[in-house]
Design a protein with these regions (language model features):
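Short amphipathic alpha-helix with an adjacent loop that forms part of the alpha/beta core around
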Residues: 74-77, 146-147
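Generic structural signal for residues in well-ordered beta-strands
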Residues: 68-70, 129, 187, 213
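Short, basic, glycine/proline-bearing loop/turn elements
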Residues: 57-59, 126-132, 159-162
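Catalytic core of membrane glycerolipid acyltransferases/transacylases, capturing the structured
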Residues: 45-52, 63-64, 77-136
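Glycine-rich, highly charged phosphate/nucleotide-binding loops
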Residues: 67-69, 136-142
Length: 254
């Protein structure tokens, strides 16, 4: 303070010594950062608006056409990173899973090859889906999903990796099992009933059915880790989650 009072303030001398172009460059940089922040906010806003609008439309359709009902939705945490895991037997499963989570915006993992379709590509972009190359160990996509989870997002996955050919539950894929073990967040098992009858693999049109979703209790990350007999046994973690999903199925289901 004494130096500034006597007229020799180094900060003031530094600021006064900046040429005019320096001030313009600094102002332009700050303006660019502000624009980038606004663009990010707009993109996040429109993505959220698209998700909730699409969810409302899908939910209305599922309830009217398939009398969809959900049991145990209260088991889905309202905030914080969480993985929503369900069985997979139909292309209807992703929107059904999203409709079964009333308070969460769900980011899905999807097969990258599906985005080759123009309209699906636009849809996945709007939904901010995490695109996964299923045929190659896509570590980048798995890390992106883990990052989303650590940021507090809800990520929806189908551990089987593909639609069941006969509606029965299949084994979890290795990459997804790796994600379940590494995410360190609760995993909520969900069983979807009725979508296989409504629109099975290879179907060209929708068939009559009733859709029901049963949501189980969250599996703590500690339990998933303890399920592995040795470090790196991700298959055991995947098997635990698939067992919990199967336990939610009606008694007459395999």
């Amino acid at each position: 303070m004494g130096a500034c009072a006597s007229g020799g303030c180094p900060v003031a001398e530094f600021l006064l010594g900046i040429p005019a172009w320096g001030w313009w460059a600094g102002a332009a940089g700050l303006f660019a950062l502000w624009l980038a922040g606004q663009a990010w906010k707009r993109e996040a806003f429109w993505s959220s608006l698209f998700y909730w609008t699409a969810r409302a439309v899908c939910l209305a359709w599922f309830r009217l056409k398939y009398r969809m009902r959900v049991t145990g939705a209260e088991n889905i945490p309202r905030k914080g990173g969480v993985v929503l895991c369900a069985n997979h037997a139909s292309y209807l499963d992703p929107p059904v899973l999203g409709c079964a989570a009333p308070h969460r915006l769900v980011r899905f993992m999807a097969r990258r090859s599906l985005a080759k379709n123009k309209w699906l590509g636009i849809l996945y972009h709007q939904l901010k889906a995490i695109m996964l190359d299923r045929d190659r160990g896509d570590l980048g996509a798995l890390k992106a999903a883990i990052k989303r989870l650590k940021e507090g997002d809800a990520v929806g996955i189908f551990p089987e990796g593909t639609r069941s050919p006969d509606g029965t539950i299949q084994e979890a894929k290795g990459g997804i099992a790796f994600l379940l073990a590494k995410a360190a967040v609760p995993v909520v098992p969900m069983y979807i009933e009725g979508t296989f009858r409504a629109f099975p693999k290879g179907a060209k049109k929708f068939a009559p059915s009733r859709i029901a979703v049963t949501v189980g209790k969250p599996i703590p990350p500690e339990e998933i880790l303890s399920a592995m007999p040795q470090k790196g046994d991700y298959a055991a973690a995947g098997a635990l989650v698939m067992r919990r999903i199967a336990q939610l199925a009606p008694k007459d289901k395999p």
